């Protein structure tokens, strides 16, 4: 989850629908040294607790990959390590059973199937920005990347 606070993007966590914690590797104004659940204090990672109403925006990002003419949820996370290994996973539910059987998906659990694919198999990436909390009414923002834009996006991903 991400938050925009004072026009800057942060990793964020939402609790109880209103309590937000921002995370940063920079000690921005009002941020304190992060303390993990075991009580260890970090010198290079910081956090700031706040009410959701103090934010400019709060959202979750989800991805879908266009594979053989159909969009599927990205099951693998968008992290550098997996991108460098050219490893992507897609998932589908029972509603697409005939299609996933034909495309060689494997059963993950009772209602979900998955398949690992490579970059060359991805025809497009749909980036879905879903507002959270009090920002939900703003609606989804969807961006579709194709061709070189996919490669540029994947090259820009950091951990």
Language-model segment annotations:
Residues 1-159:
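Short, surface-exposed polybasic-aromatic patches that bind anionic ligands, especially phosphate groups
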């Amino acid at each position: 989850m991400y938050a925009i606070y004072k026009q800057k993007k942060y990793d964020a966590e939402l609790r109880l629908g209103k309590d937000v914690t921002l995370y940063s590797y920079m000690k921005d104004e009002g941020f304190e040294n992060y303390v993990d659940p075991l009580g260890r204090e970090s010198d290079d990672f910081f956090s700031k607790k706040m009410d959701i109403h103090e934010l400019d925006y709060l959202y979750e990002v989800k991805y879908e990959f266009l594979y053989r003419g159909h969009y599927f949820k990205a099951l693998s996370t968008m992290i550098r390590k997996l991108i460098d290994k050219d490893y992507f996973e897609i998932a589908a539910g029972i509603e697409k059973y005939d299609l996933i059987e034909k495309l060689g998906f494997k059963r993950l659990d009772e209602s979900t199937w998955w398949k690992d694919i490579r970059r060359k198999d991805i025809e497009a990436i749909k980036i879905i920005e879903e507002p959270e909390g009090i920002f939900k009414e703003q609606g989804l923002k969807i961006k579709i990347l194709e061709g070189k834009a996919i490669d540029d996006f994947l090259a820009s991903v950091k951990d």
